[in-house]
Curated annotation (Swiss-Prot):
Annotated region (Amidoligase domain), positions in chain: 1-259
Keyword Nucleotide-binding: yes
Protein known as: CTP synthase
NCBIfam families the UniProt entry points to: PRK05380.1, PyrG
Catalytic reaction list: UTP + L-glutamine + ATP + H2O = CTP + L-glutamate + ADP + phosphate + 2 H(+); L-glutamine + H2O = L-glutamate + NH4(+); UTP + NH4(+) + ATP = CTP + ADP + phosphate + 2 H(+)
Gene for this chain: pyrG
Positions annotated to bind Mg(2+): D70, E138
Single GO MF descriptor: glutaminase activity
Amino-acid positions noted as binding CTP in the UniProt annotation, renumbered to this chain: S12, D145, I146, E147, K180, T181, K182, P183, T184, Q185, K216
Physiological role: Catalyzes the ATP-dependent amination of UTP to CTP with either L-glutamine or ammonia as the source of nitrogen. Regulates intracellular CTP levels through interactions with the four ribonucleotide triphosphates.
Classification via HAMAP family: PyrG
More details: CTPSs have evolved a hybrid strategy for distinguishing between UTP and CTP. The overlapping regions of the product feedback inhibitory and substrate sites recognize a common feature in both compounds, the triphosphate moiety. To differentiate isosteric substrate and product pyrimidine rings, an additional pocket far from the expected kinase/ligase catalytic site, specifically recognizes the cytosine and ribose portions of the product inhibitor.
Amino acid sequence: MHYIVITGGVISGLGKGTITSSLSYLLKNSGFKVTNIKIDPYINYDAGTMNPYQHGEVFVLDDGSEVDLDLGNYERFLDTDLTGNNNITTGKIYKSVIERERHGDYLGKTVQIIPHITNEIKERIKRASSGYDIALIEVGGTVGDIESMPFIEAVRQLRSTDDVIYSHVTLVPEINGEQKTKPTQHSVKELRSLGISPDILFCRSEKPLGKDVIEKISLFTDVPASGIISMYNVKNVYMIPEIMMRQGILEYIKKRTGTSNHNLDYTWSNFVENIKNPAESVDIAIVGKYIELQDAYISHKEAFSHVTGNTGISVNIHWVDADKLLNSTHDLKNVDGILVPGGFGYRGVEGKIIAARYARENRIPYLGICLGFQVSVIEISRSLLGLKGANSTEFDNNTDYPVIDILPEQSNVSDLGGTMRLGSKKVLIKDGTIAKNIYKSDIIYERHRHRYEVNPDYIERLEDSGVIFSGTDDEKIRMEILELSDRDNYIATQYHAEFKSRPLNPSKVHMHLVLKALEYRRNIYERNTSGISR
């Protein structure tokens, strides 16, 4: 078994997850069976209850696990489905150890960080990596953080039983035009003080590292120059595997592991070329409540990148604060499409309802996801059914028209963590609908994360107003997809299609939105050139 451990130094946010994902892609396409493991040192059991402002998007796996957004990167780059076992947190480790202690598994021993916590960490790593040739382990946080210490010690101990390559992500800042190596030197020194000497350094910088800088880093860190990889800024993360490949990272790893008989099958050439040189572009508004931290919507951003890579249509995202739409819809005036993503809590909901109405009334291509699906129902109920004050019981428990209501099985749930309708669920698609044309299938499986649904008492009235519920759950009780009978560019889904979008297999509904946005843009151009203003 081969392990590649990725740690980070100097500062957080250097892109360990993207580097890990890119290296995984190269190794997988060289013929290795590869998996990724993310270690998150926080005491939370999982990411499910974390504020997106602090932690970014909560990513949902097929098995319903709510995990760090880096696992979304892993799935996209590896084109695979991971499980909750691929995300190790301090909360999971301590919960397991304490439960075992209460059960008497330690036979009266004093339970300590070493060996009991570190052994639990190693057991979980081995469980998640079983059956693979190489497992890449990303240790969250920065070397030296007190929360990370047990995990650093655990991955250090791996070397006694398995082949381990230690890699370290550092920062090489540029000051007055000179690339500075001191932060990297000190970060490696800190890592060594914990018993780990890195074999590879991934050096983040604005521009490619100069040869003299690489030689200097090599001299002071004892990492060979061939193991120092310049990770400079690029336009799109899907260009990174090619940058690594050009610097010989695969040859270095193959030599280190003694597996030199694999040849790379680089499948992204056309995909990356379309991202670099798109033929056309569209402007799409994402109307959200967490737009100050765009990582809260990273899977939507990546889904649009996947569409670009497959079509050559670039997506210029306009980040629109939902609350600002309460005063003016000016930010929606010149866009070719509108996406209303998921979210929780009342703040921003009325702005999202305004966005849904603006798209419907102006026939602008629209995609609603999760809450974006629910606000479409609320908006149509208010505007077309005349149900003034129609709402979701999530936001107004006393509304006269609860067109969105809590799932029956959720009504007595008190805990927030891991209790929603989560994970991959079957969706049945009706014939003769836009959804059927998009998916070309009667059955799909998509990931969910919600507590509320369309109230069955209002379905018939909504359908009479022109709503088509073109997708349902397998019992045909829960509504999953909404479209309108008088157009083909308005669709909303209860599920999160963005979570299953992949570079070479983009989300079908994101693809549909972009294609309809381009059609809308071309129509506007034709009208303008004919003397009709937008």
